Amino acid sequence: ETLPEPARTGWFDYDHFYSDHVFEEELPILRRETSFRSVCDVGGNTGKFALAAASFDPEVKVTIADLPEQCAAAKEKIAAAGLSKRIALNPCDILKSSPADLPQGIDVWWMSQFLDCFNNDQAVRILRLVRGAMEDGAVLAVNEIFGDRQKRDTAALVVDECSLYFTAIANGVSRFFNSGEFMECLAAAGFRVRSVRDGLGLGHTLIIAEKA
């Protein structure tokens, strides 16, 4: 949110173009997997998924856990949508947080293209943090793009080239995972994969996992 214009608008228009096409497909899948009534969007960014989840089911309560500046930006959009009573904000630095810093009583812990902003050790640390906050019966739902799970070679090449862009331009760490590498991170953090669905949106994969 601290990007200067026109970079800020350009980046979020690009990012939202992909995410906006996948949330409407993934929420019904989540509903079939679990009768959730609460969701925590870890790394909720501008609140796009939180707004989609709240609109999907009027009984669902959503919490965004992200940096204070991201929560402040999301707050404006949430208020504009008239959903301030159903979408809560949990400002925190995930890398410096403990399970006690995260909301309680959450059914679905959601991460959308969030862990690919970190190196493997950091991703495992974040996953362990969330696992520590999860109650029995809760699930982890991860929306990611994997080059090795694309249906066509051209799509895989596009994902891999975008990954190189993120590493070189963003922060030197961001990149898209290889799916096998990501599964290893989940296992290292104490998760067992329940289901994997490819080909959602414009090439996303939805992984639903639970505590091992």
Q: Which residues does each predicted region cover?
A:
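Alpha-helical subdomain
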Residues: 33, 38-212
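Conserved Class I S-adenosyl-L-methionine-dependent methyltransferase catalytic core
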Residues: 1-37
